[in-house]
Amino acid sequence: MSNASYPTGVENHGGSLRIWFHYNGKRVRENLGVPDTAKNRKIAGELRTSVCFAIRMGSFDYAAQFPNSPNLKHFGLGKREITVKALSEKWLDLKKIEICANALNRYQSVIKNMLPMLGEKKLVSSITKEDLLFVRRDLLTGYQKLSNGKTSSIKGRSVVTVNYYMTTIAGMFQFATDNGYTSGNPFNGLAPLKKSKVKPDPLTRDEFIRFIEACRHQQTKNLWILAVYTGIRHGELVSLAWEDIDLKARTITIRRNYTKLGEFTPPKTDAGTGRTIHLVQPAIDALKSQAEMTMLGKQHSVEVKQREYGRTAVHKCTFVFSPQVTKQQQLSGPHYKVDSIRESWTSILKRAGLRHRKSYQSRHTYACWSLAAGANPSFIASQMGHTNAQMVFNVYGAWMKDVSDSSEPY
């Protein structure tokens, strides 16, 4: 071995080959971890030549060429270690200026559930794809944890929820990758779980009649008639004001939404903001009935948080639907909350003896009835606040094929 010929910059170190070169004015050595053979000496010499050429050309990426080199830290190129918990705190803090409070709350909830599963004290760089596969399995099939740390009797989560959790955390790990905390995102190549396409479950005409008859107050009837005959989102429904309605023109302009966090915001999508809903006669009749109860009510100034960080607007609102109509005023606010709308829906279904559905089916009922009546999908999309008709086709395509020729006109 002592008589072996070595290319310039190639040397034997403990039976293995290493190369040396100058980088940033310093002589550095890199172990190649290959045995000292004639063939390997030739390859090592070629590698060293290419490294020196890249350095001269200013295109040498030390971390890419030698990702595990102990020399990286001497040049400030090493991985920046951070724990999963510290990463989540940093990521959320930076996300605050990008997303609305409602979205931030969802992210915080995801991280609260995921941190114990990932290991909050583990280094981000140590998380592997195998770790993530086990986390995903536990999310889907394991028992959920309560806020007090105890295990609940609720087992598993839906595929939709699991995919949302994983996608959210994947974004956090991409942030880590982009900023040098890990050499690669372990979520790369991890496909979402397959999910079945859930068909809409609208109320039939007969069910809707039974539903309305089971309402205990005229305001409740008016609210659900308007919801079903407009397809309005429930956050938009509870924040609807008489200032948004033109009964003569038979239109509603959607200007705001009300979130679970108790904030007024613009509607969910840009396409849904400021959209005009054209009212059919049942909706007009419901609003005329409701006008007798609330149109002359107190006008409130509400702060609406805009999409641009830190910006707000003030809207003057005489709310169309008010819990003060049916309850003692001192115990109620000027408008409903979204959760109370859902509770109302569930209670009415029970009283009417109808099969349980989620309250969002009021929106599906509008779309399905409209399609059954031959309405243009693009028109329906604009009424519901979708960007284009593709969403209508995606969600209601299968249902459209099942519509009977005997469907009643809308």
Please report, for each region that a protein language model flagged, where it lies by residue:
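Short, Arg/Lys-rich segments that mark the N-terminal edge of DNA/RNA- and chromatin-recognition modules
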Residues: 1-38, 262-263
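Conserved tyrosine-mediated DNA breakage-rejoining catalytic core shared by Y-recombinases
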Residues: 13, 206, 240-317
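Basic/aromatic-enriched alpha-helical hairpins
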Residues: 26, 76-153, 172
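Short, charged hinge/linker segments at domain and secondary-structure junctions
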Residues: 59-71, 126-130, 174-196, 409-410
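Short functional hotspots where side chains directly engage DNA or cofactors
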Residues: 123, 188-189, 249-254, 358, ...
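Short, basic (Lys/Arg/His-rich) helix/loop patches that form interaction surfaces
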Residues: 148, 213, 217-218, 230, ...
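Basic, Lys/Arg- and aromatic-enriched nucleic-acid-binding interface segment
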Residues: 148, 153-159, 163-165, 178, ...
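DNA/chromatin major-groove-contacting recognition/catalytic segments
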Residues: 206, 210-211, 263-266, 394, ...
